[in-house]
Swiss-Prot record:
Residues 45-71 are annotated as: Disordered. This is Large ribosomal subunit protein uL4. The keyword Ribosomal protein applies. One of its GO terms (biological process) is translation. Belongs to the universal ribosomal protein uL4 family. Coiled coil: none annotated. Part of the 50S ribosomal subunit.
């Protein structure tokens, strides 16, 4: 498969059909994205049940003879400042996904991006200084605004310039994830980065 370089239309980049020419497996992509989204949840929510809240364990009044409803504890969930019924506890939302499935989902996503012409390949994509205006002008020149930029190695200038832009993000190949890949209208990737992606997915 040949990909035309956007900044040099006379040059093409040869990539593997096995990696970038697959059918779109919607079920697999959905499963991997749900797993990824669940796994990044903190899961640190916590509440106190009736055994954990502070308060007396004494029975407020006797069981019978007062005319009032029977009560055994001031810490009951029915009472103000009592415990919480079915109190939330810290837990892990991690869902295991095999490496082969994860790689398969990434291959499927990249293949679909190419089919929909949403993957834009540049030989080089950099800015001279970490200035947001420079990045805005550069993206305006190539008519991209809702875009994920993927580089082979960390580019501090791009990262700093993109921090204050809506719907623009910069990631390295090692830090890209399936949710980011499908969250933007376009994915801009450098030729060195896509070669590294091919190495990782084969």
């Amino acid at each position: 498969m040949e990909l035309v370089l956007r900044d040099d239309e006379h040059s093409v980049l040869n990539v593997s059909d096995i990696t970038f020419g697959r059918d779109f497996n919607e079920a697999l992509v959905h499963q991997v994205i749900i797993s990824y989204s669940s796994s990044i949840r903190q899961g640190t929510h916590a509440q106190k049940n009736r055994s954990e809240v502070s308060g007396s364990g004494k029975k407020p009044w006797r069981q019978k003879g007062t005319g009032r409803a029977r009560v055994g504890s001031l810490r009951s969930p029915l009472w103000r400042s009592g415990g919480v019924t079915f109190a939330a506890k810290p837990k892990s939302f991690y869902q295991k996904i095999n490496k082969k499935m994860y790689r398969g989902a990434l291959k499927s996503i990249f293949s679909e991006l190419i089919r929909q012409k949403r993957l834009v390949v540049f030989r080089e994509f950099t800015i001279e200084f970490p200035k947001t205006r420079l990045l805005i002008d550069k993206l305006r020149d190539i008519k991209l605004h809702d875009v994920l930029i993927i580089t082979k190695t960390k580019d501090n200038n791009l990262k700093l310039a993109s921090r204050n832009l809506y719907k623009v993000d910069v990631q390295t190949v090692n830090h890209m994830n399936p949710r980011s890949l499908i969250s933007f209208n376009h994915v801009l990737i450098t030729s060195k980065a896509i070669q590294k992606v091919e190495e990782l997915l084969t």
